[in-house]
Curated annotation (Swiss-Prot):
Belongs to the UPF0589 family. InterPro entries: Vfa1. The lineage of its organism: Eukaryota, Fungi, Dikarya, Ascomycota, Taphrinomycotina. It comes from Schizosaccharomyces pombe (strain 972 / ATCC 24843) (Fission yeast). Residues 81-142, 165-187 are annotated as: Disordered. Transmembrane segments: none annotated. Residues 118-142 have a biased composition (Low complexity). This is UPF0589 protein C32H8.01c. GO terms for biological process: late endosome to vacuole transport; vacuolar transport. GO terms for cellular component: cytosol; endosome; nucleus. Residues 81-92, 99-117 have a biased composition (Basic and acidic residues).
Length: 187
């Protein structure tokens, strides 16, 4: 059975993409090919090298801008639904003043729909361009990423194992990790 690791307070699942020079390339965390892309936390406690192609994989990391755009679309859809329900309630009450404002609301709704359509068209163009381009470009679409929960747990486990190994090495060097000889003489 898998042992659940407690979430560490010192790590946050918010990574910034940085680029190092060609001389400082190190192996990728996933495929061990030399890469110049580094994901690093705000606190700089955790960093690792990763190929740019892995960042495109939704099973590895999700760009923060994509998460925000999805939540914004959900919020706008909820607001539109509320506006429509208010319009239905206004029609039921039959207030003449509110019926004069209805054409303006319809114009606003069509403008919102156009904005949503243009945003979805932009997302489709981004998705098609990212899937069609196979080589790494120097311009990145997003500089901030959230790791997939399993990858993030791997990073936490890596640091926990590293801390345990350092503690064991310290105890062995100081001699406190070994049992002491008996203080009483043997019979």
């Amino acid at each position: 059975m898998l042992k659940k690791m407690p979430m560490s307070n010192k790590f946050e699942n918010f990574y910034t993409l940085r680029q190092v020079s060609e001389v400082d390339k190190k192996p990728c965390f996933i495929c061990y090919k030399p890469t110049k892309w580094v994901l690093i936390t705000k606190t700089k406690l955790d960093f690792f090298y990763v190929c740019y192609n892995h960042l495109q994989d939704r099973g590895f990391a999700t760009p923060i801008s994509v998460i925000k755009s999805v939540t914004n679309k959900i919020d706008t859809n909820k607001l539109e639904a509320k506006d429509e329900s208010k319009n239905v309630e206004k029609d039921a009450t039959g207030n003449p003043q509110e019926s004069k404002q209805e054409p303006n609301l319809e114009v606003q709704q069509t403008e919102k729909e156009k904005d949503v359509d243009s945003a979805s068209a932009e997302n489709e163009s981004i998705n098609s361009s990212s899937s069609s381009s196979k080589e790494c470009s120097t311009q990145t679409q997003s500089k901030h990423y959230n790791l997939h929960r399993d990858i993030f747990q791997m990073r936490i486990r890596y640091h926990a194992n590293r801390a345990a190994a350092e503690k064991t090495a310290r105890l062995l060097q100081s001699g406190q990790g070994l049992p002491s000889p008996p203080s009483k003489p043997l019979p």
